[in-house]
Amino acid sequence: MGSYTDKNGKVWTFSVKYELVLFLKDKIKIDLLEPYENGNNTLEEVVRNRYRMLELLFNTVKFCNRDVSDAEIWESFDDGAVVNAQEAFFSDWVNFSQKSGRPDVAAAILKAQELIQAGIRAAEAEIKTVDSSQVIAKITQAVHENISAPIPSFGNSQDG
């Protein structure tokens, strides 16, 4: 079972089971049983496309918490809770895959999680190399140059 806690301290739970798997395949065309087989690219899609990941998480939480409004679910993802929900979902998906006799799918999911974390670390490292004072100086210079540039004229002002 997966769970995450929202900013108000509410614990949201869900569980990847066959009923949910069939629902997601029918509702949003995401195949958790065969996420990379027969031309299916579910695993890559949810790892690379943030909107598909949100769609997957929303529909998972909604399916497992049917008495809750859509707005409450979307609000529950605020303040970083979506990252926790994503990690909980992947963990539960791995457990489901292992118990369903699909260790290959579980291994692929774990590898995808590693790639996500590596991408985050690379982005954080790149951000740390940015010298914000240089960026601000370049922007200030560009603004100053554009303000002091002559205003182009359109047409001939002597024709009148």
Regions found by a protein language model. Name each.
Residues 48-59:
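Elongated alpha-helical scaffolds
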Residues 12-14:
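Short, isolated positions in well-ordered beta-strands
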Residues 1-10, 30-44, 48, 63, ...:
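Charged interaction scaffolds used for protein-protein
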Residues 23-26:
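Short active-site loop/helix that positions an aromatic residue
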Residues 16-21:
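A short, sequence-level motif marking secondary-structure junctions
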